[in-house]
Amino acid sequence: MIIKILLLIISISLFLNISIGIDENQIWKSCGTPQDIFHINSIVVKPTPPVKGKLVKVNVNGTFIKDVVAGEAKIIAKYNNIMTLYNETNDLCSPTAQAIIGNCPFKKGPTYLHSANFTIPASAPNGYYSGNILLTDNFNNTITCINVAFNLQ
């Protein structure tokens, strides 16, 4: 169950390409470059950081600089920097991925909008959660790269 929760938290952030530090109020950090295919215009995450038993709302608005018709999503998720909860590479346009990140293919230009709402179960263990998402297109160009980290209390 906790793996599914963490994957949902990380997956809804797949297209966040922002350069901010990671602290208790800023849980996302770009590990990409200005050449990435997706650029974020705005993001709203409430509450930040996520809270057990509470609804988490994420809204993302961004721009693709070119079409993306296929690719891969490599996702690594860890608990307390010790236990690997998830380490897989998935088809970016699979039904599972589309349910989380939106319909594939993605078209060039503004505006890509994605909204997700979910609740973290009150039974989720306290601790430090971290992850890395690297999205690439079918030519192995980076769509975006994201690090996520937060303490769940």
UniProtKB/Swiss-Prot annotation:
Question: What is the species listed in this Swiss-Prot or TrEMBL entry?
Answer: Dictyostelium discoideum (Social amoeba)
Where is carbohydrate linked to this protein? 17, 61, 87, 117, 140
Give the Gene3D superfamilies listed for this entry. 2.60.40.770
What InterPro entries would the database entry show? Ig_E-set (IPR014756), ML_dom (IPR003172), NPC2-like (IPR039670)
According to the record's subunit comment, the protein's assembly and interactions are: Monomer.
Source taxon at top rank: Eukaryota
How is this protein named in the record? Putative phosphatidylglycerol/phosphatidylinositol transfer protein DDB_G0285639
Q: Sorted alphabetically, which SMART domains does this protein's record hold? A: ML
Which family is it part of? Belongs to the NPC2 family.
Function in brief:
Catalyzes the intermembrane transfer of phosphatidylglycerol and phosphatidylinositol.
Task: Respond yes or no to whether keyword Chloroplast is given for this record.
Answer: no
Write the signal peptide boundaries: 1-21
Biological process GO annotation list? Answer: sterol transport
PANTHER family annotated for this entry? COUNTIN-3-RELATED, NIEMANN PICK TYPE C2 PROTEIN NPC2-RELATED
Q: Which GO terms describe its molecular function?
A: sterol binding
Which keywords has UniProt assigned to this entry? Glycoprotein, Lipid transport, Signal, Transport
> Which parts form a coiled-coil structure per UniProt?
none
